[in-house]
Structure formats: structure tokens, C-alpha cells
From Swiss-Prot:
Known function: Part of the ABC transporter complex MetNIQ involved in methionine import. Responsible for energy coupling to the transport system.
Listed InterPro entries: AAA+_ATPase, ABC_transporter-like_ATP-bd, ABC_transporter-like_CS, ACT-like_dom_sf, MetN_ABC, MetN_ABC_transporter-like, NIL_domain, P-loop_NTPase
Enzyme class per UniProt: translocase
Gene name of the encoded protein: metN1
Species this protein is from: Staphylococcus epidermidis (strain ATCC 12228 / FDA PCI 1200)
Protein name: Methionine import ATP-binding protein MetN 1
Subunit and interaction comment: The complex is composed of two ATP-binding proteins (MetN), two transmembrane proteins (MetI) and a solute-binding protein (MetQ).
Claim: Membrane is one of the keywords in the record: yes
Length: 341
């Protein structure tokens, strides 16, 4: 279990004080994958660097498996960092060392005998799919291969927690998916708790059990990924979800012909089993209404499917629409009115 209690981080500059992280509270279950998303400058990278005390909080507590990180001695912190490992956006490999020696490096620091360190490193290199590349140097590797080395190195001391700071941001889409699949694989095999930082909502959708959304140093929304996608509350969250679902219909609303007074354009958001239910058939039969489909999409998450449907109902009374909306809510379908005549 990871607990963050009222975490604050201030930077003092010559001209002003900067509040990078503003009273953040988080509870992260052991064995889960927890995502933190936000735009540049939201404070997410500063936050994750406090998990292993690369940055010290100005105030507040970070407790990992019962240990208050800020209260550990230097020797205790070194040992704790072996169990709270990290991978980075730009890999942070040692360019003068080949793949094998990059992976053995943390084992050398931990005092592991060279024979055992080499054996462990070779196992990890095979695990991340780089068998045969042990003698290659970082300059000879692709971005995805470099990140695989970073993952192998991070796993060298059998960590309990893996921190991922924008680990796929420098990669192309296909390589990103390969790295995400690898992280899911190692998490399953080694029962890791993964905390990842990203500005890409599809990474959250594919990987995470829960997500926290940050803006201006604060957590503005938090919850299970499926719930946040189904019913985002904050405007920043809505923007992330909209971009990931390729839902740009609202931008086109102003170009539509004026609606009749009893017409509606609505978005239906649904998750899980609802994505395969015959919603349109249900609406037309149960409510005896005509429906035009304007836009639709379905995405897969780690724990199921989610999607949206934008429809035009050309004629429906206000009272009938209230009943229609209520019935869909009973089926766990969220209804959002985009335009009314």
C-alpha cells in the first residue's frame, strides 16, 4: 500500500515561489496499476519523483509499505530505493556500458557478487525480449530497445514498486503498445505495484486500474478508470477522454442545421457489457422514437470495454425525453444533452 497524505512541494526562485504539488492525497493498493495524468506543468513528474525521494516534499507524508520515505536515514533510503524502482522518458542509460553491464549496474551497487549479478541480468534481458543483444551499446539500440533495457535494469533488485515517468512519451505508437504489453507482463509475473505518469489517456485506458487527474499541482479528479471514462466530471478530464475516444462531434455542432423545437442531440456513454447491448433497438422499440446515429466508437480498457454514441432524436416531447433518459440511466448508460431545439 502506498499512501500520500497532504503532499506539498514548493520551489523557491529568485522572483517567486512555485507551488508544484498542492496538498495531494492518494491511496494506491498493492499490486495495482495506478495512473497519474495531466498536461505539461501539472505537477505529475514532480509528484512521482517524491515517491522515492528524488525530490523531497516540502510537507506531508509518503508512506510505502509502512515506511515514511522522508524519515528514512540515508542507508535506509538506499535500501528502499532498491524496492521502489523507476524508468524514465529518456531511458537514462549509461552510454559507456553495453546492455549487460547497464542491467548489472544496480546489482553492483547493491553488492551482489559478479557471477550472480550476470546470471540475474541475463535472465532479465531475456524477459524483456533482448536476448542476443547483451553486447550492444545504447547508441546501437532503437528507442523501444533502450526502454526495454531500462525496464530490465529497474527490475534487477526485485522491486515491489515500479515508477514510470512518461515511459512511452518518446516512442512511436507501435513501440508504445509493445512496451505497455511488456509492463503488463512483468507486473503479472512479479506482482508489482506500478505507478505511471503520462499525458496520454490511451496509456491510462490500456494499463490502469485507477487514475488521478492533475492540474496546477492538484488532483482534480480520481477514480476507477472505467468510471472516469464513463462520466468525467472536470473539464480537463473531459478533454482527455474526448481526445482518446476521437470524439470531436461537439466541434461540429455549430455547423448543423437548426433543430426543431422537440429535437435532441445526445451523447450516450457506456461501459462493460453495455457496449455489446442493442441500445438502439431498445430505444426505438421501448420508446417508439426515431433515432439517427451521428457518431460512435468503442475502445478497450484493461478491465473491459467503453464507448460512446452520439444520436439525433428528431421528435420527442420533454416529458418523454425525461422518461427516456431515466430508463437509460437505469441501464447504467449516461446521457448527456449536446443540443436541444
Amino acid at each position: 500500500m502506498i499512501k500520500l497524505n497532504q503532499i506539498v512541494k514548493r520551489y523557491h526562485t529568485k522572483d517567486k515561489d512555485v507551488l508544484a504539488v498542492d496538498h495531494v492525497d492518494l491511496n494506491i493498493e498493492s499490486g495495482s496499476i495506478f495512473g497519474v495524468i495531466g498536461f505539461s506543468g501539472a505537477g505529475k513528474s514532480t509528484l512521482i519523483r517524491m515517491f522515492n525521494n528524488l525530490e523531497s516534499p516540502t510537507s506531508g507524508e509518503i508512506i510505502i509499505d509502512g515506511d515514511n520515505i522522508s524519515q528514512l536515514s540515508k542507508s535506509q533510503l538506499r535500501k528502499k530505493r532498491q524496492k521502489v524502482s523507476m524508468i524514465f522518458q529518456h531511458f537514462n542509460l549509461l552510454w559507456s556500458r553495453n546492455v549487460l553491464k547497464n542491467v548489472t549496474f544496480p546489482l553492483e551497487i547493491a553488492g551482489v557478487p559478479s557471477g550472480l549479478a550476470k546470471q540475474k541480468a541475463l535472465e532479465l534481458i531475456e524477459l524483456v525480449g533482448l536476448k542476443g543483444r547483451e553486447s550492444a551499446y545504447p547508441s546501437e539500440l532503437s528507442g523501444g530497445q533502450k526502454q526495454r533495457v531500462g525496464i530490465a535494469r529497474a527490475l534487477a533488485n526485485d522491486p515491489d514498486v515500479l515508477l514510470c515517468d512518461e515511459a512511452t512519451s518518446a516512442l512511436d505508437p507501435q513501440t508504445t503498445d509493445e512496451i505497455l504489453d511488456l509492463l503488463l507482463k512483468v507486473r503479472e509475473q512479479q506482482n508489482l505495484t506500478i505507478v505511471l505518469i503520462t499525458h496520454e489517456m490511451h496509456v491510462i485506458r490500456r494499463m490502469c486500474d485507477e487514475v488521478a487527474v492533475m492540474e496546477n499541482g492538484k488532483v482534480i479528479e480520481q477514480g476507477a478508470v472505467s468510471k472516469v471514462f464513463e462520466n468525467p466530471q472536470h473539464e480537463v478530464t473531459k478533454r482527455f477522454v474526448k481526445d482518446d475516444l476521437n470524439d470531436d462531434f461537439e466541434d461540429s455542432l455549430e455547423y448543423l442545421e437548426p433543430l426543431d423545437h422537440d429535437a435532441y442531440i445526445v451523447r450516450l456513454n457506456f461501459t462493460g457489457e453495455n457496449t455489446t447491448e442493442p441500445i438502439i433497438s431498445y430505444m426505438t422499440k421501448t420508446h417508439n422514437i426515431d433515432v439517427n446515429i451521428l457518431e460512435a466508437d468503442i475502445k478497450n480498457t484493461k478491465n473491459g470495454s467503453l464507448g460512446f454514441l452520439v444520436i439525433h432524436i428528431p421528435h420527442i416531447s420533454e416529458e418523454h425525453f425525461k422518461q427516456f433518459k431515466h430508463n437509460l440511466h437505469e441501464q447504467h448508460v449516461n446521457v448527456e444533452v449536446l443540443k436541444h431545439g
